[in-house]
């Protein structure tokens, strides 16, 4: 396949949006996933089949079929942004597009591979793939307003895929969908109250958009309840804590590092993330056996230490020193981050029946 840089040069000469080089993979960038398709196909849905069938019926209605239609508000909107705001906004669009496209690829492949053996599950994944493709295409089109786009075909063929067992897919995608809901709805509500901070018309679409994320999260909630072992027992409690911490820490460190984007929207990145983390943690108690104690004063103190360590790691990378010297400079900060994450993981969690007794 032709590398994206070569395509970019051809695109510039033809007046089309340039194809943007994918960002380098790091611990903070969206990942592409694959799983054990045979195990997924063999899943017995009977413990919660009624709820899954009801969710599938909701998917069939495709409430947002006509929602993602660009209008005249997009005309010239990109030209109104200053260079720095353009830069951080394009970064946001790229990260969001990559994340949505990652979901599309996983759901589409699942729907295709399990269709014969588990048609209900396959249909649900097909509907979610439809939604994710729609989101990714809409975001990529918005990037085109700024003169660049992602080559999604190139990403499909060249991105590294991480293998997760099905239950890990459940934890990771459930949290991704639910945290996506709270991120989008928080931005939408803030901009409704502060319209002068609405830097681009794509935010007008976030209210309906986030309902897709919410429905997808509800599907994984129902699927985990159909596989009770995924949310029962000591092992499940430990894995739920791990994924909650991994998702929350990754988001917090990433968003603080690109706080300029949130400042452009009139938001404080730290306060925004604290709100999203609190709401996602609360929502997760509906299905996870335990959640994190995010109100403990040490929780954000330790995350801030990780932010500081990551800044030091970035400075080491940019120092111009030789590779061995950079490695030696970075080792203490990697170790410090590992220690802080271990302290966060082993902090006492909150049992979900105590957190949301009425719901559970």
Swiss-Prot record:
Region described as Disordered: spans on this chain: 1-20
Residue ranges crossing the lipid bilayer per the database entry: none
CDD domains xrefs: ACSF
EC number: 1.14.13.81
Coiled coil stretches, renumbered: none
Entries under InterPro entries matching the protein: AcsF, Ferritin-like, Ferritin-like_SF, Rr_diiron-bd_dom
GO MF, one annotated term: magnesium-protoporphyrin IX monomethyl ester (oxidative) cyclase activity
The protein's required cofactors: Fe cation
GO BP annotation list: light-independent chlorophyll biosynthetic process; photosynthesis
Keyword rRNA processing included in the entry's annotation: no
Pathway: Porphyrin-containing compound metabolism; chlorophyll biosynthesis (light-independent)
Catalytic reactions of this protein: Mg-protoporphyrin IX 13-monomethyl ester + 3 NADPH + 3 O2 + 2 H(+) = 3,8-divinyl protochlorophyllide a + 3 NADP(+) + 5 H2O
Superkingdom classification of source: Bacteria
Top EC class for this record: oxidoreductase
Keywords: Chlorophyll biosynthesis, Iron, Metal-binding, NADP, Oxidoreductase, Photosynthesis
Family per similarity comment: Belongs to the AcsF family.
PANTHER family assigned: MAGNESIUM-PROTOPORPHYRIN IX MONOMETHYL ESTER [OXIDATIVE] CYCLASE, CHLOROPLASTIC (PTHR31053:SF2)
Physiological role: Catalyzes the formation of the isocyclic ring in chlorophyll biosynthesis. Mediates the cyclase reaction, which results in the formation of divinylprotochlorophyllide (Pchlide) characteristic of all chlorophylls from magnesium-protoporphyrin IX 13-monomethyl ester (MgPMME).
Protein name per the record: Magnesium-protoporphyrin IX monomethyl ester [oxidative] cyclase
Lineage: Bacteria, Bacillati, Cyanobacteriota, Cyanophyceae, Synechococcales
């Amino acid at each position: 396949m032709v590398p994206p840089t070569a395509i970019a040069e051809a695109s510039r000469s033809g007046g089309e949006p340039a194809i943007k080089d994918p960002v380098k993979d790091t611990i903070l960038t969206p990942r592409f996933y694959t799983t054990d398709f045979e195990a997924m196909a063999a899943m017995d849905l009977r413990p919660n089949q009624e709820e899954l069938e009801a969710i599938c019926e909701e998917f069939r209605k495709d409430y947002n079929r006509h929602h993602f239609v660009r209008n005249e508000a997009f005309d010239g909107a990109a030209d109104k942004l200053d260079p720095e705001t353009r830069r951080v906004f394009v970064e946001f669009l790229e990260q969001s597009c990559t994340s949505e496209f990652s979901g599309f690829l996983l759901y589409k492949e699942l729907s295709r591979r399990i269709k014969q053996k588990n048609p209900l599950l396959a249909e649900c994944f097909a509907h979610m793939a439809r939604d994710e493709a729609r989101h990714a295409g809409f975001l990529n089109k918005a990037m085109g307003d700024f003169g660049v786009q992602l080559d999604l075909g190139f990403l499909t063929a060249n991105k590294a895929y991480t293998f997760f067992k099905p239950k890990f897919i459940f934890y990771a995608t459930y949290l991704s969908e639910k945290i996506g809901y709270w991120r989008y709805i928080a931005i939408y509500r803030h901009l409704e109250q502060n319209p002068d901070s609405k830097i681009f018309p794509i935010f007008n679409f976030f209210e309906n958009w986030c309902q897709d994320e919410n429905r997808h999260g509800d599907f994984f909630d129902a699927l985990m309840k159909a596989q009770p072992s995924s949310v029962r027992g000591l092992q499940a409690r430990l894995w739920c804590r791990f994924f909650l911490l991994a998702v929350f820490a990754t988001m917090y460190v990433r968003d603080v590092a690109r706080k300029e984007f949130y400042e452009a929207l009139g938001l404080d990145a730290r306060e925004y993330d604290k709100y999203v983390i609190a709401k996602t943690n609360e929502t997760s108690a509906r299905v996870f056996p335990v959640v994190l104690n995010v109100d403990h004063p040490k929780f954000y103190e330790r995350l801030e230490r990780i932010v500081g360590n990551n800044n030091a790691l970035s400075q080491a990378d940019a120092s111009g020193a030789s590779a061995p010297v950079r490695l030696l400079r970075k080792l203490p900060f990697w170790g410090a981050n590992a220690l802080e994450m271990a302290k966060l993981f082993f902090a006492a969690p909150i049992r979900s029946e105590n957190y949301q007794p009425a719901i559970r």
